[in-house]
Amino acid sequence: MGMQTYGNPDVEYGWWAGNSRLAGFSGKWLAAHVAQAALIVFWAGAICLFEVARYTADVPLGEQNLILIPHMASLGLGIGEGGQIVDTFPYFAVGVVHLVSSAVIGAGGLYHSLRGPAILKEGPARAPKFDFDWGDGKRLGFILGHHLILLGLGALFLVLWAVFFGIYDPVIGEVRTVTSPTLNPFTIFGYQTHFVETNTLEDLIGGHVYVAIIEISGGLWHIFCPPFKWAQRLIIYSGEGLLAYALGGLAIMGFTAAVYCAFNTLAYPVEFYGPPLDFRFSFAPYFIDTADLPSGQYTARAWLCNVHFFLAFFVLQGHLWHALRTLGFDFKRIPAALGSLSEDVVDAKA
């Protein structure tokens, strides 16, 4: 089963169609995703080194149009008292590690593209376990489970980093360890309606403890348990359907990140990102700086927030597009429908 859910099942996709060309080849699909991961890691490393070269101690960090150094600073790297950057070598090291990692991951992408099996079912060892068909909910759940576990481990890594190495606390202006994360579920889940107001590192890290538990538990569940009957009836198992679900989730995360970045000063300290933003609405919603800056200059917070917001907006349009196509709506019929409608109007006037 390919990406489409209706029409011609044997569509010939052009190069611009991206991964749609590989929908029937699980090995090539894996190669594309590994290569894309390499590009992401390469971007992180290259931009990190670029920012290190541009950084100056004479201008507030939030006003230097940097987006990666503030993130690393909030993790406590290179930070002294009062949130001052005292050492940029950790940022350089992080950039180099990412560049080297991107080469290793890229080599994996090349291997799976040039030497690995086009279909994982034909591969050696455990490779066939990751072969999939778009209509096989059990196998797709198995693969989803591994993704969820990796996400959970990422959240757990942040928790361990905060507990053993410490992160920057804007309340006291110092890097400190979080030895007692909040584990009270009523406190953590009480933030659901006002999560932007998280104001202690204990609550922030405690929330990541729950995220790690939920992600890893959910991953194990999906690995060992096939979808329930009611879930199979609700979910449309097709390449385009799953793409629509993924884009919808990505849009939600983008909007959430934008709002959190705009207004929360615990995870996004003023020292590194600039002051909180104001929300405005003109032709489209947007966030503006409250800091007094020269014309055409913006804080790191404004850049991060607005980029996340507008990317989430367009990703949401992609979700709606693919969801409608999944349900059988053919956008190619719209011009014909509009043409017949205009002809009816002309005939009525005649």
Swiss-Prot record:
The keyword Cell inner membrane does not apply. It is found in: Cellular thylakoid membrane. It comes from the Bacteria. The keyword Transmembrane applies. It is a multi-pass membrane protein. NCBIfam families: PS_antenn_a_b. PubMed:8986795 speculates that the protein is probably 2 residues longer than sequenced. Belongs to the PsbB/PsbC family. IsiA/Pcb subfamily. The antenna complex functions as a light receptor, it captures and delivers excitation energy to photosystem II (PSII). The Prochlorales pcb genes are not related to higher plant LHCs. The antenna complex consists of chlorophylls (a and b) and chlorophyll a/b binding proteins. Also forms complexes with photosystem II (PSII), consisting of a PSII dimer with 5 or 10 associated Pcb subunits. This is Chlorophyll a/b light-harvesting protein Pcb. It comes from Prochloron didemni.
